[in-house]
Amino acid sequence: MGKNKLFVIFLLAFMIVGCVFDGGSKKKIVGNYYLWQWEGGRSYYLVDKHTSPNGGGLIDGTVQIIAWSDNYIYVQKKPLFSGEKKGWVIIDVKKQKITETISEQVMKERLSANGDSKIQFYSAESAWRKL
């Protein structure tokens, strides 16, 4: 096989692997939780050390809006599939527990009850830049 042909095969294989395996990158939010930037910055997922963004990460969807304190992470999620429930999830950082999807009203009530009513909310992209 000629050098040019071998080079073209290698180049094509490299391009295919690069497209299929967009490894993304992650930044620590708090505790063992990370914001994972995927698909060249078009999607953001919430993950921990043991979870990948495949399948929607920890919240079964993409992060739309996020806020955090030392004890809680508040996330508005967009489900990966249209039949799933849109809304908010709250992560208890210390207990490592995630709520079911809840309404914005319930999230605001828990935000206040948790003493986090003054924390700042960010779009996923803005949170990525802040982290």
Describe these PLM feature segments.
Residues M1-C19:
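Sec-dependent bacterial lipoprotein signal peptides
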Residues F7, L12-A13, V30, W36, ...:
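Compositionally biased amphipathic helical and low-complexity segments enriched in hydrophobic
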